Amino acid sequence: MYPARLRTTWSHSVSEDLVHWEELPTALYPGEGDEPDASGVWTGSVIYGEGRYHAFYTGYCLTAEYQQTICHATSEDGITWVKDAANPVITPMIELYEKLDWRDPYVFYNEEDKCYWILISARRLDMPITRRGCIVLYRSKDLVNWEYYGPIYSPGHTNCPECPEMYKMGDNWYLSYSRFSEYVNTIYRVAKSPFGPWRKPKKDGIGGRRFYAAKSMQDDDGRRFYFGWAHDRADRSDRGEWYWGGTFCVPHEVVATEDGGLDVKLPKEYEHVFEKHVDWDYIPVLGNAELHGDRLVEMDSVSTCTYGFLGHSEESYMLKCKIMSREVYDHFGILLKSDKEASGCLLLEFDVAMQRVSLVNLPMGVDPFWVQSCQAVPPATEPGPDGVRVCEKTFDITEGSEIDVCLLYTSPSPRDTERSR
């Protein structure tokens, strides 16, 4: 699965509303023989400048001296692309950086520096081996001749900062990238200058742990959206082996806050899709629960655990609710894709003691003795929710306060299932 997925193309899709997408002809295919992109056309970026479109991408070639290099293609209409005969246009500086990781170029015009910038993911030779990941800067006046500047960010916490990009919102500059480490995530840093220094905000994640390799764009109204990928799993099972690559996620919108942070929220376009009210029933399973009218469920879990299910017939829906907790010192949450025993499911968990919101895959690993002693629980086999959003801002889980929850669930189409194979 892994080697086959490396020989990627650049697919091209467009949308007017972030929900409905039209596929256009494939923009770039891998090369042949010993060409620098013969083993795959990896990620990069596109800019319109100097009278035409320019794509800078990672050329991958297993048989080349430098397996990962920066390649270039141009287009007059953004649809049909011609590769640069001079490819690769930027190769690793092996006296300073490793050969292996030299990729993920991000190009933009820096108004403050009055030239084009290109950011490259790399690994410094003068750093500890698992902490060498850095972002290297080149500059150009014409998108053809590039001058080396040096590492613009070396966090010392990652093997490689994948898919970096930089942009300005308000008075702040933002540098985002996907952290390839044991703490995998798409994260961001903030600075007053594009040259740094880059500071870590209190909450630096864009999306959850599996919202990865995310790249953003800004529309004509100044709204910025991140487009990322959720790793898929073998057999489309929540218990399957994690694969490299994955499924296109619901876009995430980011909004700058007064303190320089980024709030992440669901684009309003998705809420407009689910405008029809869905009738539902509460089906109690365990504990003490009472339905008030047709909109309020009250649960009393003193000395017990209380849960039940919402009965309805929809395959794709949006669940919006308010949760108010009282005298809760453990956790509460929402079960997703659960069996009746709530033993094989996903749990959107609000942990009061830890002040943490998590999407937990149950059952979790336990001591081997208990695994052998307990009844076997079949794993969930259906794909998980497309996206989960918990409020739009950082919040405290406190007694008597309301928590707004918005959750999307869409069943995969047969075409999506076929694509995953």
Segments the model singles out, each with a brief description of its role:
Residues 368-404:
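Short, aromatic/His-centered strand-loop micro-motif at the edge of beta-sheets
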Residues 11-15, 70-77, 134-141, 188-193, ...:
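Beta-propeller blade signature
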Residues 234-287:
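Beta-propeller fold recognition
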Residues 300-369:
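Secretory/extracellular carbohydrate-interaction modules
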Residues 52-55, 114-118, 172-174, 223-225:
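Entry beta-strands of beta-propeller and related beta-repeat scaffolds
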Residues 409-416:
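Conserved small/polar residues in nucleotide/adenosyl-binding loops
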Residues 2-3, 19-48, 79-109, 126-129, ...:
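Surface loop/turn signatures of beta-propeller and other carbohydrate-active proteins
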Residues 3-8, 64-68, 128-133, 181-184, ...:
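Short, solvent-exposed loop/turn segments at conserved positions within beta-propeller repeat blades
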